[in-house]
């Protein structure tokens, strides 16, 4: 699958179910669900114990609202970074979500995901 030539709106359509799953799985502290769409490279860095520690100590990543707004794409090399406006159920304000997508084995996979 070729994603680099897709429009921002087409990328948003690809990113929405992936980010949706990350939000739901993070709120549930579900490691298997959270890592479902990860690339092989991301899986090596996604230690279940470390993720568990983050979930235990961080209200931001366990109380995310399931509504979000993608607002931009950055293309670099073989990856596209989707910028997402995210809100939280307990912490006021808006947060920046970053979802890095690429292709592995002809499937769109997560090569990076953060929220600030």
Name each model-derived stretch:
Residues 27-41:
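Short, well-ordered alpha-helical segments enriched in acidic and aromatic residues
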Residues 43-55:
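Short, charge-rich amphipathic alpha-helical segments embedded
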């Amino acid at each position: 699958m070729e994603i680099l030539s897709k429009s921002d709106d087409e990328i948003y359509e690809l990113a929405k179910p992936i980010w949706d799953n990350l939000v739901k799985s993070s709120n549930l502290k579900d490691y298997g669900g959270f890592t479902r769409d990860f690339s092989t490279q991301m899986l090596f860095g996604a230690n279940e114990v470390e993720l568990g520690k983050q979930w235990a100590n961080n209200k931001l990543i366990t109380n995310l609202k399931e509504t979000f707004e993608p607002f931009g794409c950055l293309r670099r090399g073989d990856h596209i970074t989707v910028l997402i406006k995210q809100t939280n159920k307990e912490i006021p304000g808006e947060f920046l979500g970053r979802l890095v997508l690429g292709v592995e084995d002809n499937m769109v996979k997560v090569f990076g995901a953060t929220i600030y």
